[in-house]
Amino acid sequence: MFRGNHPTRIDDKGRLKVPADFKREIEDKFQNQTFYVTSFNGKEARLYPMEEWERFEAKLAALPSLNPTRQKLLNVSNYYGQVVEMDGQGRVTIPGLLREAAEIKGEVAVMGFLQYLVVRNAEHLKNEIESAPFTAEDEKTLSDLGI
C-alpha cells in the first residue's frame, strides 16, 4: 500500500522522479513498471500501477454501459489519461494536458492513496487543506462507516 507524502519536483520535461519509498513498493509488488496516469477532476494526477488500473477497469466494465456516471468517469479519465512507462532512472512523465490543467510544475506533493499515487501542485494542496480541514463531522462519518 502507498502511504504518506513525499514532496519533490517535476522537471522541465514534465517528468516526476518517483520517490524512493514508492519506487521500492512498486518494484516489490508489481510485475512491470507501467502506469495509467489520469485524473478524475483535472486538479491532480493519479498514477495507477497498471495492474491496479486494470482491476478498477474490470469493475467499471461490469457496470451497465449506458450508466451516465460510468460514461462521465470514462470521458474524464480517458481525456487526461495515458499509459506511461517508468524509465530506468525511476521517472514517469505526466501527460502535458494534465500537467497544464492541474498546474503540476515545480514543487509537487506525491502522496500515497493506498492503491495509487496522487501528484498535486504543493501550494494548491496546502491551500485546499487549510480552507477545508478535516473536521469532527468527518471523523463521525468515518466512525459511522466502521473506521
Swiss-Prot record:
Residues 5-52, 81-124 form the SpoVT-AbrB domain. It is found in: Cytoplasm, Nucleoid. It comes from the Bacteria. Keywords: Cytoplasm, DNA-binding, Repeat, Transcription, Transcription regulation. Belongs to the MraZ family. HAMAP family: MraZ (MF_01008). Forms oligomers. This is Transcriptional regulator MraZ. It comes from Koribacter versatilis (strain Ellin345).
